[in-house]
């Protein structure tokens, strides 16, 4: 029997790492502190709980870097992608999932695996021996973060993710709102009508911005650094950057036609995306916020169609802790000071569910290979996974290192025509090259 691999944290990264290692024949001990020790953002003790959005973003594997990452994870028989497919919700060209059944299914599959044992406990310090993957995510416990800081001498960087509110569908006024995906994207009627749209004229938009800016906000605790990841900015922070910022961001009106008044062009549009399979819950897209609860209710009810809305969950903020990975990790995701420990997921400085799961997939495979006496190099940088792991383990500038989503800017350049059509061709060239390289890496 091979040595055991210990994995700390059963989020996206830890769950995927455990699955990959166990499928390679390595016994896994999965340590998860929930539900015994909770966090601000989690509601349950389920594995791979989605605490922010319910979307894995674009599923276009030909011209989108996130979609390509989906493709690579499916090719590697990833558990997260398998369960996402099983609990998929209509969302235009995006991959959105029914979050609770998704997490329950991931949990059930891992608990049922004969080579995986689950220990419900907090790991408070970095172990000096054994094979470990730390995948504790953005809410790494204070004790473990302090242990890491003591070992590395490095300050863990901190920023904040904001959580979007969720509305009960039956309380949305569909005489004002209408169903449509932007540019009518999607192959089925469900996909083409996956979003609920609430229009605003200029006067309504200006009043909404005024209310956002004036609303009471949650203050940061003493000693916390008020930094944000740009992909998850609170709407009030976006509004502070300029009054027009929101209508060029999550409230942009392009690609949408008011079903009730097709001749009227909205000045801004608020979109809601289905949050569960039943279609009883919808989250307000891009509306993560740190407004206080009372202020949220008042401000969001200014949105046409949501005047009488009831909220299943209001927005909030949570802290995100991550390593300066280019300084601390080697190209196999091992801690240079203690190579028996790997890191995976958001704690390494990737941002997003899919990116976190992908780094878990790599860490699990590389750790298992090492235990089995094999050397498994990271995927080539031409692949989505390879581009991400190269970025966090040395490609990024250490002094200015910040969490990163996967994007084609991380890939080695490719020659292609310029212009709008040329850009689409170039993205296709990136994904064609990546798929060939990833297939070769999988078969090696």
Swiss-Prot record:
Q: EC number(s) in its UniProt entry?
A: 2.1.1.74
Q: Does the keyword Nuclease apply?
A: no
Can you list the GO cellular component terms from the UniProt entry?
Answer: cytosol
Q: Does the keyword NADP apply?
A: yes
Would you say which domain of life the source belongs to? Bacteria
Chief location of this protein? cytoplasm
GO BP? tRNA methylation; tRNA wobble uridine modification
Q: Which reaction does it catalyse?
A: uridine(54) in tRNA + (6R)-5,10-methylene-5,6,7,8-tetrahydrofolate + NADH + H(+) = 5-methyluridine(54) in tRNA + (6S)-5,6,7,8-tetrahydrofolate + NAD(+); uridine(54) in tRNA + (6R)-5,10-methylene-5,6,7,8-tetrahydrofolate + NADPH + H(+) = 5-methyluridine(54) in tRNA + (6S)-5,6,7,8-tetrahydrofolate + NADP(+)
Question: Which molecular-function annotation in GO is an example for this chain?
Answer: flavin adenine dinucleotide binding
**Where found, per UniProt?**
Cytoplasm
Cofactor or coenzyme needed: FAD
List of residues binding FAD: 9-14
Q: Which UniProt keywords apply?
A: Cytoplasm, FAD, Flavoprotein, Methyltransferase, NAD, NADP, Transferase, tRNA processing
Q: Sorted alphabetically, which InterPro entries does this protein's record hold?
A: FAD/NAD-bd_sf, MnmG-rel, MnmG-rel_CS, MnmG_N, TrmFO
Which family does the entry's similarity section mention?
Belongs to the MnmG family. TrmFO subfamily.
Cited function = Catalyzes the folate-dependent formation of 5-methyl-uridine at position 54 (M-5-U54) in all tRNAs.
Descriptive protein name? Methylenetetrahydrofolate--tRNA-(uracil-5-)-methyltransferase TrmFO
Q: Which organism was this protein described from?
A: Cereibacter sphaeroides (strain KD131 / KCTC 12085) (Rhodobacter sphaeroides)
- Taxonomy-wise, where does this protein's organism fall, top ranks first? Bacteria, Pseudomonadati, Pseudomonadota, Alphaproteobacteria, Rhodobacterales
